[in-house]
């Protein structure tokens, strides 16, 4: 992230610098509690603090830093599955964890009306037929007339050979082959 400007110096950072002269002021990713143990990749970088407790202008970036979903501006997740999708998307977790999480999750699927109990599949832009499911109401496409809640494991049993697309209109989506959910 060398093209991004250095982190803004906040009043809290200035207070900390005044209390700790002749040190480094470390900028921590927002996903972490500054008073807890921070992994090396959770430190954005540091400003030098002089003998008077003033923060220097130069910011030293941590080359090991990997931004968390929060640092990337992703919205607060509303479920464990959304949280995992964000951590996978930001490069902190493995895609291999996704199938088991989908099977354990409550998902929202298309429903044409309140009595619709079918699993509906739709073609994507290339013509491939997929079953869409959403992790929360916020991700339900506005064009859907309705939705119903199902367990991932129950939905997996009804996919046939059709892949499952999670949060089809984004911003974070995932495509899982039906075979990955058996």
Please name every model-derived segment.
Residues 1-182:
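An interfacial alpha-helical scaffold signature
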